[in-house]
């Protein structure tokens, strides 16, 4: 059940960083953290990742509740004893709940992490988004490793 602690840590870090941004930055304000690469940029998003489906909050409520339920079910039924699988689900669950809290309480999500590579500005994101991405990457690694084990490949 350690994976629920990971989920709680992700939610706490996500909500704490968003609270800090809301309390200390104006929307649109940018603070350079690593020159030419990393900025804290206060932004509000009422859509999904990269502002997809902006303004369709009812859709996100429904989908998120379903996804959270499915993840908890899978964690309870299948994740025990599968460390990488359970950790990946914990990161996904923490990210989903972190952004869901924002949508329910504020009808928008606080984003603030902005990275720049040369002339490319990656879409602004938050800890929950990063957690979702880490969870998905870990899940892909788990599936690849598990598939190799199943087939007996070293």
UniProtKB/Swiss-Prot annotation:
Domain of life: Bacteria
Residues the record marks as active site: 111, 129
Catalytic activity: Release of signal peptides from bacterial membrane prolipoproteins. Hydrolyzes -Xaa-Yaa-Zaa-|-(S,diacylglyceryl)Cys-, in which Xaa is hydrophobic (preferably Leu), and Yaa (Ala or Ser) and Zaa (Gly or Ala) have small, neutral side chains
InterPro entries: Peptidase_A8
TM stretches of this protein: 55-75, 84-104, 124-144
EC number, as in UniProt: 3.4.23.36
GO biological process: proteolysis
Function: This protein specifically catalyzes the removal of signal peptides from prolipoproteins.
Keyword entries, A-Z: Aspartyl protease, Cell membrane, Hydrolase, Membrane, Protease, Transmembrane, Transmembrane helix
Protein name: Lipoprotein signal peptidase
